[in-house]
Amino acid sequence: CQTTPVHGLTAEQIAALKSEGFTQTEDGWEFGLSDKVLFDTDEFVIHDAARQTVARIGRTLLKVGLNSVSVYGYTDSVGSDTYNEQLSARRADVVANVLVEAGMQRAAIQTIGAGKRNPVADNSTATGRAQNRRVAIVISTR
């Protein structure tokens, strides 16, 4: 007996998302990489441990038939809006490239450079700025 998908997702897909650390938001299921994929100031290089995490997530998503994602890149508040939007787009692209290496189709990955919008921490402290240099992988349920 198959259960009815919640907003288009099956119970198996939801279980896989939860097991990878995704949380449900108003936009869908989100894996926030602020504590797992932190970018250095003015950088868009993904570290090896973070690369492995993203690749594992990509393989898990594909295994349960979740073939498309949105990747949002973010920055801290230092720098101009234009520069931060470009830098955040590069961060999203780097994560998208790792998902492609894991087997996802590039055309199925939307990347968004959100700049300094939607901070998760206080930009007035070094720790807060570090947490805001992040990427989020979102599975839309709309």
Annotate each language-model stretch with its function.
Residues 1-18:
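Bacterial Sec signal peptide processing site at the extreme N-terminus
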Residues 31-37:
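Early exported N-terminus immediately downstream of N-terminal targeting peptides
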Residues 74-142:
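Periplasmic OmpA-like peptidoglycan-binding domain that tethers envelope proteins to the cell wall
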